[in-house]
Amino acid sequence: MSDKILVFGHQKPDTDAIGSSYGFSYLSNHRPNGALNTEVVALGTPNEETQFVLDYFGVKAPRVVKSAKEEGVDTVILTDHNEFQQSISDIEDLTIYGVVDHHRVANFNTAAPLFMTVEPVGSASSIVYRKFLEANVEIPKEVAGLLLSGLISDTLLLKSPTTHVTDHKVAKELAEIAGVNLEEYGLAMLKAGTNLSTKTAEELIDIDAKTFELNGSNVRIAQVNTVDIPEVLERLSDIKAAINASMTANGYDDFVFMITDIVNSNSEIIALGAHPEKSEAAFNFTLADDHAFLAGAVSRKKQVVPQLTESFNK
């Protein structure tokens, strides 16, 4: 096996998954003491928002891999995730050298000690930025741009309840290094990810989707950002058909789909599967035609997953 270490974010990568992995790979390769031989890769192609970021800063998208072993590699670093079902296909057969994440730790174990940093901040990119400072490694403009974009994406330009008090300082400093106006660039970037008109229903429910094991149930939780929830709901029947087909094909017990209005900071929730009552209890609403409005909800990590976890555990 090669001595190379692959660095990647989760399946169906978002901007933070790609930004944090790109940044951490660069840092790992340029540490003054103990540099590693890493390559940033991805577990999927960039979405429209992420492609906007890559084009803006002139960065080539990481190549997509399906299996580390097929690459002749047996050691990996994970960013923006830790749960095995969200990772590379052969994760259980690999050595995990390190993890940089800002999510819950679950369905994760290793046979050997590792470097692991998990913090309740707005993005994995925020953590990577601080690691640059700790290592005293200069951040190139394009790397700063990718890290900034990961933070903007995950916190909806610092408006999400997942935003940590330290993220504001991180965003300001990264914007200065990247040479962008935080507000202007952030809005343009977020809007680039809201063009859903060209997406099929099958693509919509798969743009940003993660699988969670909740008390023995396999629950898929997906999210799309928009500036017009009613426009998306015009396609409700097609979306529900796509969700049902996905559950059948992939063995999901339940599927929760968040349609998030990034302007007004609300979401519409579509919930299908074996336990719709768990969603109703989690969010204290009543589903009508399998969907309901959830005021103030923009974060899957903080406003959906914990509530569903508690509901499924009852």
From Swiss-Prot:
Cofactor binding, per record: Binds 2 manganese ions per subunit.
Pfam family, one: DHHA2
Recorded family membership: Belongs to the PPase class C family.
GO CC annotation, single: cytoplasm
Gene name of this polypeptide: ppaC
Annotated binding of Mn(2+) 1, by residue: 10, 14, 80
EC number(s) given by UniProt: 3.6.1.1
Enzyme class: hydrolase
Catalytic activity: diphosphate + H2O = 2 phosphate + H(+)
GO molecular function: inorganic diphosphate phosphatase activity; manganese ion binding
Tree of life domain: Bacteria
Keywords noted in UniProt: Cytoplasm, Hydrolase, Manganese, Metal-binding
Organism of derivation: Lactococcus lactis subsp. lactis (strain IL1403)
Binding-site list for Mn(2+) 2: 16, 80, 102, 154
Needed cofactors: Mn(2+)
Name this polypeptide is given: Probable manganese-dependent inorganic pyrophosphatase
Compartment list: Cytoplasm
UniProt cross-references to NCBIfam families, sorted A to Z: PRK05427.1
Alphabetical list of SUPFAM superfamilies matching this protein: DHH phosphoesterases
Transmembrane as UniProt keyword: no
